[in-house]
Amino acid sequence: VLFRSNVFGLINKVYEDPNVWMTSGSFKYHDGRPGFAKAPNTDIDVRKQTFTLSHMRTWKSWLWKQIKEEDLRDEKGQYWGVAGDLSFMFPMFEMSGLQNYRHINDVIYTYNESNPLNDHKVNMKKVMETVHKIRSMNSYKKL
């Protein structure tokens, strides 16, 4: 859920800088707790860092198109059933680097963690296995 009415205007303002290829922003949980989203510490080994490229996420379409289709899928050829966001956020950040990425500090999204169908509530073991597999994949080269 968008946190405020001017979220898209704020994001558009960020993209006025032609050097911005992708963003991630800050969120709050539905009960008011602050979320964990923040900019990565460095653009080196982002797959080994605590995952912080969270809601709300945006990117240039051409950047998305650089992701290999097979990296968006599991070993059975199916799109990742859980934790699939890592399969596209890691490659796009690796290709962008810190200089083409912007973290939006303003809270722009409310995350409904009360949903009983959240992946981490339904099958945390599968989430952890998938996270490990995606983190173990080859990194992308910076563009």
Segments predicted by a language model, with ranges:
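Nucleotide-sugar donor-binding/catalytic module of glycosyltransferases
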Residues: 1-142
